[in-house]
């Protein structure tokens, strides 16, 4: 069982529940590619998703934790102005690396393991459609994660 974070333990205590009974389940953002070009395209698509979430004030505590509150406020301003196409450019490679597993197919299992071990008891892996369709990649990834 993975240790529960302090904030999760505090929430459980406030609700009168036993934090030890919880299992943290994670579903990380993924940017994957067979080569650098495909990886870059996947990263760009993920910037769109993350910029939407990061524009929402409910998520600004996450940005503040990393010192990116100004980015959150600018994303929020752009969203209110309907300037959705400008928002992904504000999500840096550093932000992607912080919030997602960014990897070439050959490195994915190792990077996922590094990111999830000690954090989540269970990890849900929602592979992009192209990666999911590549049965060799899926089989190899499962084998590497089980090793």
Predicted regions and their residues:
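Active-site-adjacent structural elements that line small-molecule/cofactor binding pockets in enzymes
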Residues: 1-147
